[in-house]
From Swiss-Prot:
Homodimer. NCBIfam families: PRK09194.1 (NF006625), proS_fam_II (TIGR00409). It comes from Nitratidesulfovibrio vulgaris (strain DSM 19637 / Miyazaki F) (Desulfovibrio vulgaris). This is Proline--tRNA ligase. It catalyses: tRNA(Pro) + L-proline + ATP = L-prolyl-tRNA(Pro) + AMP + diphosphate. One of its GO terms (biological process) is prolyl-tRNA aminoacylation. Belongs to the class-II aminoacyl-tRNA synthetase family. ProS type 1 subfamily. SUPFAM superfamilies: Class II aaRS ABD-related, Class II aaRS and biotin synthetases, YbaK/ProRS associated domain. Its EC number is 6.1.1.15. GO terms for cellular component: cytosol.
Length: 575
């Protein structure tokens, strides 16, 4: 490919609405263009990067025994109604009607469609297990699409679905996909970590997320410094506290005026106590009914843990009007004593101490000496808070570190969440009808490209790992009008092609500085400069985009010298 024949519309400035590095650089490098909110055109170089990523995903899926198919993006409502997700999924599901008034949606995922397919095709245990996948455009009507390809409404995804006859088979399929994902991200040259995760709206018994490590990541990972434990903070367990056999006696409750002190910080400063001496009482609404959750004043409620404990579909903070109704006080003064809420839950850390300061369910008033066992009606104590670096690993007790990551893959063991309501069954050896056990496995292919850039960039542009780069190498011909120089550049180009290198020849009539800046911006891993002065000295200048290290390759014996240098550059990426 010649640069002069390729459409690479690079820009000097990023668009004003681009917030994150990947959005800025993908746009500046001419790889994407925005069509409308959350929807992008993949330009030639952007599409090449996506296709290279998809090719590696496809190879590893095939190696793991999965079979590729293609399902429609448009899905009938009746399947979603049958699974129970038509109402549950909410406004992210884009719904519409055809001319006959029939309801449809644009698929954000394909559990219903694949289960419907398999239940109509697979009858016997002899046909199991089976694992089917596709790489397809999806649509999710995000309320706030942002960050370019990181959180768009339309995106490219690989989704796979396994069907097994029993739990043991489902576990085998799950871990086969887990290993395939490990292979994918290693081959892509990314620094990543697999972490325990919450299953969210997909459901299922357990799941793992694959996180690309990046300081700009939206997710926080809690990882043990002593063992292999790692989890998304939504999922990360906090070990139960050491509870004394007996706690010191607590005196009578005492009302304390706290005029105008609504926040934990304000109350504790006013009373001259640490935030750990206070219990926060949070009023929430779970599937339309009020509930209360108690955590220590210096802790943060983990609403995902509470939602899983309640097994509810919707959970949100109560509106101020409801808080006033159930507590008799404005926001900021709720407490567990005399609270007019039927279900009250407390973080298990509160078992380790007593004699708390709480809200009094009365304006401008708090309580001292509150004993939860004595003074409050707690339905259950459980792990309800967000883990912190001060907490110990729940597995081995060693310190926890928090890092940032970007979710690019997710594997779920679904169990019978979809196969049971959709009646996806088979006949076993004894002729008995049984429900298939499922798993589902997703990789955000377009998101992988964006997250790669979030992890690998510098002040000059993108730093692509060789497997993802639109072109692994660029040959910059400094004087394409000089027939001898261009001829030599074309010889080197042919040699690189013969070695299987995806290379572009920059034959534009531009200043060398422009060519160098574009090569860095687009992120070409292997950069070669062919110029008259270098040829006169018998060398070609080579630069490793990742390190910036320059070396000289001899014109005589160029092929072997390049092969050796390329291997060294790839080794630097762990490839």
């Amino acid at each position: 490919m010649r640069w002069s024949n390729c459409y690479i519309p690079t820009l000097k400035e990023a668009p004003a609405d681009a917030e994150v590095v990947s959005h800025k650089l993908l746009t500046r490098a001419g790889m994407i263009r925005k069509l409308t909110s959350g929807i992008y055109i993949y330009m030639p170089l952007g599409l090449k990067a996506i296709e290279k990523t998809a090719a590696i995903v496809r190879e590893e899926m095939n190696r793991a025994g999965a079979l590729e198919l293609s399902m429609p993006m448009v899905q009938p409502a009746d399947l979603w109604q049958e699974s129970g997700r038509w109402e549950f999924y909410g406004k992210e599901l884009l719904r519409f009607q055809d001319r006959n008034g029939r309801d449809y949606c644009l698929g954000p995922t394909h559990e219903e469609v694949i289960t419907d397919l398999v239940r109509g095709e697979v009858r016997s245990y002899r046909q199991l297990p089976i694992n089917l996948y596709q790489i397809q455009t999806k649509f999710r009507d995000e309320i706030r699409p942002r960050f370019g390809l990181m959180r768009g409404r339309e995106f490219i995804m690989k989704d796979a679905y396994s069907f097994d006859r029993d739990e043991a088979g489902a576990d085998k399929s799950y871990w086969a996909m887990y290993e395939a994902y490990q292979n994918v991200f290693k081959r892509l040259g990314l620094r990543f970590r697999a972490v325990e995760a919450d299953s969210g709206s997909i459901g299922g018994s357990f799941s793992h997320e694959f996180m690309v490590l990046a300081d700009t990541g939206e997710d926080t990972i809690a990882a043990c410094t002593g063992c292999q434990y790692a989890a998304n903070v939504e999922r990360a367990e906090v070990a139960p506290p050491a509870v004394p056999a007996t706690l010191p006696a607590v005196g009578a409750i005492e009302e304390v005026p706290t005029p105008g002190k609504h926040t934990v910080e304000e109350v504790c400063a006013f009373l001259g106590v640490p935030q750990s001496a206070l219990v926060k009482t949070l009023i929430l609404v779970a599937d339309g009914k009020p509930v209360a959750a108690l955590v220590r004043g210096d802790r943060e409620l983990n609403d995902v843990k509470l939602k899983n404990l309640l097994k509810c579909d919707e959970l949100e903070l109560a509106a101020p009007e409801l808080v006033q109704q159930v507590t008799g006080a404005p926001v900021g003064f709720a407490g567990p004593v005399g609270l007019n809420v039927e279900r009250v839950f407390a973080d298990h850390e509160l078992l380790a101490s007593d004699g708390w300061i709480t809200g009094a369910n009365k304006g401008d008033t708090h309580l001292r000496n509150v004993s939860l066992p004595r003074d409050a009606k707690i339905e259950r104590y459980a792990d309800l808070r967000v883990i912190t670096p001060a907490d110990a690993c729940p597995r081995c007790g060693q310190p926890i570190e928090l890092t940032r990551g970007i979710e690019v893959g997710h594997v779920f063991k679904l169990g019978t969440k979809y196969s049971e309501p959709l009646k996806c069954t088979f006949l076993d050896e004894d002729g008995k009808e049984k429900v298939m056990v499922m798993g589902c496995y997703g990789i955000g292919v377009s998101r992988v490209v964006a997250s790669c850039i979030e992890q690998n960039h510098d002040a000059d542009g993108i730093v692509f790992p060789p497997p993802i780069a639109p072109f692994e190498a660029v040959l910059c011909c400094l004087d394409p009008k000089n027939g001898e120089t261009l001829g030599k550049a074309e010889e080197f180009y042919a040699e690189l092609k013969a070695q299987g290198v995806d290379v572009i020849l920059d034959d534009r009539d531009e200043r060398p500085g422009v060519k160098f800046k574009d090569a860095d911006l687009v992120g070409m891993p292997l950069q070669l400069v062919v110029g008259g002065k270098g040829l006169a000295r018998g060398i070609v200048e080579a630069k490793d985009r990742r390190t910036g290290e320059k070396t000289e390759l001899p014109v005589e014996g160029f092929a072997e010298a390049f092969r050796t240098w390329r291997a060294a550059v790839r080794a630097g990426w762990g490839l």
